Amino acid sequence: KNEWKIKLLNLKMKRTNVQLRMPHDSLFVKAQITDAEVIGGLFDLLRKSYSVRQLDWKEGAVKYDRPFETAKRGFDYNHLQLSQIAIGVDSFSYNPEKLNLKIIYCTLQDKSGLKIQRAGGSFAMDSMQMQLPNFFLETPYSKLKARMTMDLNAFNERNPGKLNLALNASIAKPDLIAYLGPANSAAIVLLNSFYA
């Protein structure tokens, strides 16, 4: 048994690079942390319970790559290159029964050109339900606010659970083009007719 408990008072990171390659997998993740600080961490390895009171990641970049997946134009979740990252977490906790996360600010830019100027909100998930009570996201062109509660069995064929979503969004053409990619000509023609 691993009965270690690690208490972290304050951790500051500057000009730090982290690389991760999964064994028996082609997945590659690289994080560049120019300036970050973690306050109030508690890690119970026996109970697999982890919490952080505050995280301020002021500048950095992340590369996430699955090299054997075909690359596509636009936003490509198999080949992410995120830059200008700044993330503020007010609280984070995880154990096998529940996950809680509160993001107070988030900015980043993807290689596709998609740029998030502001994002944040709370997120909670347990073995039964996922909750997103106050999510918001803004780009230079678009805005989105959402509230969602979803039972994890919401899409079961038999006795499905509930999904409640309240969405208020204004999505602009430049963001859709950045997400879909300029090579997606059929979608661009449809967008041009929609916005005309």
Regions found by a protein language model. Name each.
Residues P23-S26:
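Exposed regions on extracellular, virion, or secretory-pathway luminal proteins
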Residues K1-R21, A31-L46, L55-A196:
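Extended amphipathic, helix-rich lipid-handling scaffolds
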